[in-house]
């Protein structure tokens, strides 16, 4: 295995973090990773929020349905996309994955919390004073893992096919 596949295969969603802060150099590096994601027509329709303040993270956690753990994470990223760009969702999801893999490469665990289709998306945008025209695509809680729970992945034969799909 090479370093990239090792990082990808070692990544797991973590919802319980140590209180240790994530360093500014790591944050800058993972933002650069996110900004280098592939994007349709080079639109780069993203805006990245870096949320270190516990009060802000707690307010966001209160707005979410499945992201209450954001309040206890030492860091959260908010990824927004320009709604007027046709492929903002695909582009911003690619950026979110790059962000998560960049964190993992630095030994920082994370958990992606959905945003785009959630009723709280507009409330988060307003809370963070993000301009109209952007919509929340994802929230990513991040930090050093306190607890890692590994769930098994589906068998490859159940999720992949070659040439054409054939029912078993």
Which role fits each region the language model picked out?
Residues 1-168:
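Acidic, surface-exposed loops and disordered segments
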């Amino acid at each position: 295995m090479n370093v990239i596949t090792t990082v990808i295969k070692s990544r797991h969603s973590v919802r319980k973090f140590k209180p240790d802060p994530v360093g500014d150099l790591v944050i800058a590096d993972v933002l650069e990773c996110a900004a280098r994601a592939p994007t349709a027509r080079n639109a780069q329709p993203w805006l990245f929020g870096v949320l270190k303040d516990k009060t802000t993270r707690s307010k966001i956690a209160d707005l979410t349905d499945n992201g209450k753990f954001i309040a206890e994470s030492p860091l959260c990223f908010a990824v927004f996309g320009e709604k007027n760009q046709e492929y903002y969702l695909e582009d911003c999801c690619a950026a979110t994955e790059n962000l998560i893999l960049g964190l993992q490469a630095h030994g920082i665990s994370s958990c992606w919390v959905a945003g785009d289709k959630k009723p709280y998306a507009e409330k988060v945008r307003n809370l963070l004073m993000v301009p109209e025209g952007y919509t929340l695509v994802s929230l990513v809680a991040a930090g050093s893992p306190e607890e890692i729970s590994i769930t098994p992945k589906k068998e490859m034969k159940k999720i992949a096919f070659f040439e054409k799909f054939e029912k078993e």
